[in-house]
Structures are given as C-alpha cells and as structure tokens.
C-alpha cells in the first residue's frame, strides 16, 4: 500500500480538480446559457417595482437590509461591490429580493449549481465584497438568513421537490430518473431505493422534508459502504465523508499566510486557536469536497473517544484574496475563483471541529473539520464529548447545502495518507481507507 512521503519543508499540494469535475458534481452550471437563463428568470420575477411593492421580505432579510443601511461602512461596501456589474443583482435591493424568492423554496435537481452562490459570485469577486463578507457583524445576519431557510427545508412544505416530475426543461424532482442517475453514479448496479432507507410506494418516498431526504441513511452500510479492513483493525483510518479529494498537505504551519496563490492551511485559524493546535504543527491534512447529490452524513475514521466538539462561527461568502478579480465565468482550463478557495475557506468559514483520540496510540489525537460552503445552514454532531465510537459509526451531518471536510494528523502520528489521493478529484468513498499506520 503506497503512502505519501513526509515532507522536509512546508509542502502544499492543491489538487484543484478540473471545472468539468466541479460541474459534474453540481457546483457549476452546465453552461453559460443555463446560468444566464436562471438570472434572467429570477430578475424578471423579483427585480421590479411590482415585486418590491407587493411582496413582503422575510423578516431576517428585512433585518439584513436594515443592517446594511444603518452601518455606514457596510453600506458603502455594498454600494462599491456592485459598481460595474451589469447583470442582476446590480444593487443590494435586488439581492434582497432574490434572497426572498430563493429562501421560500427547496432546491430542485438541475443544471444550475448552488443558487445563492450563483447570485453572489460577482460581488464575492470584488475587494468591497471581500471586506464586507469577512465582517462578523454581517455574517451574523447571513447565519440568520440560512437558519430561516433551514426551518423551511426541515418542514413538510419543502417536500414538493421530492417527486419524479420534470418541472421545466432544466429542473427535475429528486426522484426523476435524471436525478437518481446522478445520485447513484458511485453505486454501480444499485438503485436509490436499495441503497437508502425509503419507501417508494408512499408519497415523497416517506421522507418528512427536504432536509430529511438530504440526510438520508444507508439501508445496509455493510453492502454499499463497508468499513474497509474491518472495525477491529485499529491501524487503519477511514474516510469521514463521501467526497472527492481536493488537497493534501504536509508540514502544516501553526501560522501561515492566508493570501498566497496556491493556498495554505494556518492551524491557529483552521482550529480556531484551540489548545490542541500545537500538537498538529508540522502534521498532515487531507481535504475533500462533497458532491451536491452525495451522502452528507459523517462517519468516524477511527476507533476512539470524542474529546472535544467546537462550533466556529465564520464567513459564508469570502473567497481567497488572491483570486479576487479573476474572470467570471472562467474558461474550462481553470476553476472559477470560489472553487480555488477551498483551503482558504477552511481557515475562515463557519465550521465544526471535532477532536478524536484514537484507541491506537500510533495514531493518537486526530481532528476533523466539517466546513460549510455557501448555502449551508449548520454542521450538526450526533455524538457527544466523552463518547466512544468505532470506525464507520455516525458522527453527524451537513444540513441543506454544499460542504467540505478536512482530516488532520499529528507530526508524530505513524499514520500516513495514501498516495492515491494525490490525484486530482479522486473519489473518496466513505469508510474506505485514507491513511494507515506504517512503522
């Protein structure tokens, strides 16, 4: 079994999968035409005087708008970030109207990608946008927006998308053949109904809400995602999330610049200056990002004890500074700016950190960071501090939107990351091996 060698100096290998890989995973629209049609339709319905006069903004959106107008610095940033932007939203009034439309609906399966990111992409890509979107006070309001959307997505009223219908030429219900094909791409020869707990003979396959569907459970984990090597082998470290590899880094620094091209982890920022941080200096990290249609629960990578769980408030729409001003939409030779920012995002975004002390002392303490990306409401742990878990046991889940995760090893850990994950966009199946002890 090949492993990645330890590096003698700081080394970061940003895998940066191709735009086509991101597109297949639902992070990008399938074409500029799809994006333009979405924006034109949303603009036509919401960016006009009739909508503004007849439709009441959801309270958190009105609070968001009031905050912008009452804070002189934030107000000027919201004026500046829209300068030169010709396609709606062209001002914060239109942005709030678009939020008001999106946050009243559950996402459909389709060719677009995350809808909130689609309307935020251009203003994220400005210096004024970066300045505004890194402010704690503004992110407090973003969290309120997503919490409100989350309440709707957890309600029975969100189930209208859990059907086999085609809504228009680019949007489908989640039980349409097109959507099922996308969801089952990494389960060859299997069907949705056989892999996940549901009942195709009752309305909505028995799911109580969109979020219930989003966090679906395996019917038989041992068949579709077995714990590779068996639970009793404590020398093995499994994948915590179903994902694609994005980054492998060794000799990670306690403090590192967050603005360099190529990205770098800064442990003090990534781990929110936790007292455990020094143990991971010069250690290794593997990071993956999740398919929009993927399984969104987390499994334990080791047999061990949950030592600490930390919820970190952070940003939602701040892309890496070196990417600001890059072309949007980008060509197929390079991902768009936001998707070149995943390492940076892990340092500053809203996230949950989980420390686990492995039973095997050759592994010792590890960390997991579960990171929300754009329209993500919460990261929810379903375990508690002091609880013992086995490899493959449930740890928690992402809610509502796109996500990334990182797993960190101490410098003194005898576990090494498998070499296969050095390939861009390598599929990481939950419960498969990502590292193993080598003495």
From Swiss-Prot:
A cellular-component GO term for this protein: mitochondrion
Name of the top EC class for this enzyme: lyase
Pathway in which this enzyme or protein is active: Secondary metabolite biosynthesis
One Pfam family recorded for the sequence: PS_Dcarbxylase
Keywords: Decarboxylase, Lyase
Catalyzed reaction equations: L-tryptophan + H(+) = tryptamine + CO2
Biological process, per Gene Ontology: phosphatidylethanolamine biosynthetic process; psilocybin biosynthetic process
Recorded superkingdom: Eukaryota
UniProt GO molecular function: L-tryptophan decarboxylase activity; phosphatidylserine decarboxylase activity
The keyword Lyase belongs to this UniProt entry's keyword annotation: yes
Industrial or biotech use: The pharmaceutical interesting psilocybin as a treatment option against depression and anxiety is being investigated in advanced clinical trials.
E.C. no: 4.1.1.105
Record has Lyase as a keyword: yes
Similarity comment text for this entry: Belongs to the phosphatidylserine decarboxylase family.
Its biological purpose: L-tryptophan decarboxylase; part of the gene cluster that mediates the biosynthesis of psilocybin, a psychotropic tryptamine-derived natural product. The first step in the pathway is the decarboxylation of L-tryptophan to tryptamine by the decarboxylase psiD. PsiD does not decarboxylate phenylalanine, tyrosine, or 5-hydroxy- L -tryptophan (5-HTP). 4-hydroxy-L-tryptophan is accepted as substrate by psiD as well. The cytochrome P450 monooxygenase psiH then converts tryptamine to 4-hydroxytryptamine.
Designated name of the protein: L-tryptophan decarboxylase
Species this chain originates from: Psilocybe cyanescens
């Amino acid at each position: 079994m090949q492993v990645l060698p330890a590096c003698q100096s700081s080394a970061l290998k940003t895998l940066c999968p191709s735009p086509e890989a991101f597109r297949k995973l639902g992070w990008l629209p399938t074409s500029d035409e799809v994006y333009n049609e979405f924006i034109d339709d949303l603009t036509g319905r919401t960016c006009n005087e009739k909508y503004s006069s007849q439709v009441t903004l959801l309270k958190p959106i009105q609070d968001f708008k009031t905050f912008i107008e009452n804070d002189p610095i934030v107000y000027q940033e919201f004026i500046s970030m829209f300068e030169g932007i010709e396609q709606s939203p062209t001002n914060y009034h239109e942005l709030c109207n678009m939020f008001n439309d999106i946050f009243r609906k559950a996402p459909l399966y389709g060719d677009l990608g995350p809808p909130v990111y689609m309307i935020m992409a251009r203003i994220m890509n400005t210096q004024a946008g970066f300045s505004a979107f890194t402010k704690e006070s503004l992110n407090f309001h973003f969290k309120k927006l997503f919490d409100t959307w989350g309440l709707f997505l957890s309600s029975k009223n969100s189930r209208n998308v859990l059907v086999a219908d085609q809504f228009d030429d680019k949007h489908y219900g989640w039980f349409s053949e097109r959507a099922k094909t996308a969801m089952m791409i990494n389960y060859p020869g299997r069907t949705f109904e056989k892999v996940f707990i549901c009942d195709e003979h009752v309305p909505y396959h028995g799911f109580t809400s969109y979020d219930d569907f989003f966090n679906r459970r395996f019917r038989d984990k041992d068949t579709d995602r077995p714990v590779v090597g068996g639970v009793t082998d404590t020398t093995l470290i499994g994948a915590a999330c179903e994902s694609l590899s994005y980054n492998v880094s060794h000799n990670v620094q306690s403090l590192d610049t967050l603005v360099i091209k190529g990205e770098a982890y800064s442990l003090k920022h990534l781990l929110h200056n936790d007292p455990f941080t020094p143990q991971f200096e010069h250690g290794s990290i593997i990071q993956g990002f999740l398919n929009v249609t993927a399984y969104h629960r987390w499994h334990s990578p080791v047999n061990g004890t949950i030592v600490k769980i930390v919820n970190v408030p952070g940003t939602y729409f701040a892309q890496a500074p070196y990417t600001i001003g890059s072309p949007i939409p980008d060509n197929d030779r390079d991902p768009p700016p936001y998707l070149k920012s995943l390492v940076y995002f892990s340092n500053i975004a809203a996230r949950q950190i989980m420390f686990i002390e492995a039973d095997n002392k050759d592994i010792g303490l590890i960390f997991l960071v579960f990171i929300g990306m754009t329209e993500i409401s919460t990261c929810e742990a379903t375990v508690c501090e002091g609880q013992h878990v086995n490899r493959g046991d449930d740890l928690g889940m992402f809610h509502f939107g796109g996500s990334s995760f990182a797993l960190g090893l101490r410098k003194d850990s005898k576990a090494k990351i498998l070499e296969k994950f050095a390939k861009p966009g390598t599929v990481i199946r939950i419960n498969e091996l990502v590292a193993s002890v080598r003495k």
